[in-house]
Structures are given as structure tokens and as C-alpha cells.
Amino acid sequence: MNRIFGIVSLFLLLSFSSNLSSEDLKLSQKTLKFTVIHPFKTVHGVCGEVNITPTTFSSGANGVQLPKAVKIEAPLKEFRSGDENRDSHILESLGFPENQSVSFSSTSIDITDGGWLVSGNLTINGVTKPVKTKANISSNNGQIEVSGKFQIKMGDYQITPPSLLFAKAKEEVEIEFSFILKP
């Protein structure tokens, strides 16, 4: 009887632990958006190509496992705002072609309620500054979304706010990110 109980217990333990095993999740969709507010128009932009390291994450019973570090790079040539003339001005104000990208390298990632608290260095226009943001983690239909947003000030990165008809855009830029992970 003890032997049967032991075999059943071992079977249940192995069955339960196989459900807890990690599964590789690959980045399937990467979105990086920015918003600049001008007195005459709110400009929404997007970066069409975002490079992220690592490209594979692990999941387990508690959701996505905390990565040791994350590096994100957004090539400036991929920034689009819906107006080619404005896009060329954005490139110029971000120091293109001398600066080829906007980049972020994490310095710490900690678990917080519903996600991660991510700290790191953001480099824009050749200027690197520390930033901190919350990355929200949500799960839906077998995929996991990592998303969040934060604000920067143009002056902190030696960027002059654009002006139109003698009115300048607000100093603040909202940066929004969303990354979809799938098995």
C-alpha cells in the first residue's frame, strides 16, 4: 500500500512540476510610440523597428521570469509621425546622422505589483540620463504583454522643442512601449 501511495505521489509531483516548467517566450510584436504636444497639434509618432535584447524570455507558474537585463534600441530612420517634413525635422533635432538611434539599457529590474520596476539609462541625441518606469505585465490568449510609459523633457537631452507659427511644443515627450511575447 505504501508503495502504491509513493508511486501515485511521485506521479502527481511530476505532473504538477511539469506544469511549472519554464517555456520559452519569443518577442512577436514590438511597439515604441512617442507623443509631443504643440499648441496647434498633438503629434503621435511610432518607431517601426525596435531591437530588443534578449529576444527570448522564460515563463513559469508566476508568469514571465525576471530578465537580468534588457537593452532596447530604436533606429532613428524608423521614426514616423505621419508627415515626412516633420520626420526629417525630428531626425535633425535628434542629431541624425551622427546619432543613429535612441537606446535604453537597464541597470536594475525589480518585481512590483503587476509588473516590473525598471531603472536604466536612456540615450537620446548623444545624451544619457537615468530613467525609471513601471512595466505592466498582462496575459491574454496565451500571449504576454509587457507595456508602460514614461515622460522625458527635451531640454534634458539637449533638444530644442520644435516651433510652428512662433509657438513652441511642450517640453515633455511621452514615450510608450508595448512588447508581445508568445510561446
Predicted regions and their residues:
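Low-complexity, acidic/polar, glycine-enriched regions of mature
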Residues: 20-183
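N-terminal signal peptide c-region/cleavage motif recognized by signal peptidases
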Residues: 15-18
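Sec-dependent signal peptide recognition
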Residues: 2-9
